């Protein structure tokens, strides 16, 4: 019975590791998407805040959809990060440690599929202003960038596993997870 409990605990820890790796990759992709939105908005001579304000309409209604920074702009940015982070967690749980050839391409296709699922099914009913006013090509490219970033989740998962399995340090000592400082980025 102890062996079965140990396997369940090990499986649960592995799932947590994969979910955290997916969360890291999803949030990295969200920040890439936000950066792309900022560059594309500047190219189109619009404010950086137009896309975050559009996402903020889910909470504050149409009054926050303006071409400038508002108090609700932060909630729009947070919404983008949370949506992409949670989707990245699902990606991490599905792909686990399995890095395959053309993973970036699969991530880009998955990002585009996630865009269509989100904008055609979820947001159409949850917050209809977002799919109505979002710049389509700009958002599609943003979600493709998100997909490419989220495809790195198996790499992050393996790095987390290596950090906590006890790797040998350069001077012959056994390194444990204790050497990882709080807030350290695992690349």
Predicted segments — roles?
Residues 86, 142-156:
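Hydrophobic cores of alpha-helical transmembrane segments in multi-pass inner/ER membrane proteins
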Residues 74-92:
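Hydrophobic alpha-helical transmembrane segments
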Residues 128-141:
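Non-cytosolic membrane-interface motifs at loop->transmembrane helix junctions
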Residues 95-115:
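Internal alpha-helical transmembrane segments of multi-pass membrane proteins
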Residues 161-187:
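Short, highly charged, low-complexity non-transmembrane loops/tails of multi-pass membrane proteins
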Residues 43-69:
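Membrane-interface interhelical connector segments
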